[in-house]
């Protein structure tokens, strides 16, 4: 099981990428077009993200302009934004949607921080599940006499040290995101 480090690194890079993608969709003090990544509309019979059917620009710090490529879906996009958990109120002039983004209240910031912590914890659980799977594979090899008991202990220690490093990295990413959310 010499390739356990490569296996662990591959799995953990996917966990960290997933964490990063989830955090991109959280609203922070600065508005980003990524907050619209998880807003979908029905388009040609399929659930489609609004980011794939429109251009999203942020000309000012608190203004978002969404221009659908097909004007017939303007109302669908507007409704999807209203029905989302972003607490935004879009207005349409018939060709583009403008959203004046209000500053986040401290209560809303706390809710977003709570959600960010929940996301981090879910990713830590994924990390621990990866550790458990890897530990089981290594223990199975020891039972089948593919590796010695000393090798087993060394490998399990290495796995635990690597997992600890990845958990610290998740905590660091969380702290950075919390600072970004709380920034006024």
Curated annotation (Swiss-Prot):
Q: What is the predominant subcellular site recorded for this chain?
A: cytoplasm
What is the annotated localization of this protein? Cytoplasm
Q: Does the keyword Electron transport apply?
A: no
One of its Pfam families is RRF
Alphabetized, the UniProt keywords read: Cytoplasm, Protein biosynthesis
GO biological process, alphabetically ordered: translational termination
CDD domains for this protein: RRF
**Gene Ontology cellular component terms for the protein in this record:** cytoplasm
Q: Which GO terms describe its molecular function?
A: ribosomal large subunit binding
SUPFAM superfamilies assigned: Ribosome recycling factor, RRF (SSF55194)
Q: What HAMAP family does the record tag this protein with?
A: RRF
Q: What does this protein do?
A: Responsible for the release of ribosomes from messenger RNA at the termination of protein biosynthesis. May increase the efficiency of translation by recycling ribosomes from one round of translation to another.
Q: What is stated as this protein's family in its record?
A: Belongs to the RRF family.
What's this protein's name?
A: Ribosome-recycling factor
Organism encoding this protein: Borrelia garinii subsp. bavariensis (strain ATCC BAA-2496 / DSM 23469 / PBi) (Borreliella bavariensis)
């Amino acid at each position: 099981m010499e390739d356990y480090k490569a296996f662990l690194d591959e799995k953990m890079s996917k966990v960290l990428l997933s964490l990063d993608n989830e955090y991109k969709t959280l609203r922070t003090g600065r508005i980003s077009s990524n907050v619209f990544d998880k807003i979908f509309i029905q388009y040609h019979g399929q659930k489609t993200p609004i980011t794939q059917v429109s251009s999203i620009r942020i000309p000012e710090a608190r203004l978002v302009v969404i221009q659908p490529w097909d004007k017939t879906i303007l109302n669908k996009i507007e409704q999807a934004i209203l029905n989302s958990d972003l607490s935004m109120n879009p207005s349409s002039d018939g060709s583009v949607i403008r959203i004046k983004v209000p500053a986040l209240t401290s209560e809303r910031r706390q809710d977003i921080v709570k959600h960010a912590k929940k996301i981090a914890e879910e990713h830590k659980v994924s990390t621990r599940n990866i550790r458990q799977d890897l530990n089981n594979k290594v223990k199975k090899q020891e039972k089948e006499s593919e590796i010695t008991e000393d090798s087993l202990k060394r490998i399990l220690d290495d796995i635990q040290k690597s997992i600890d490093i990845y958990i610290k990295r998740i905590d660091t990413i969380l702290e950075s995101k919390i600072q970004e959310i709380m920034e006024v």
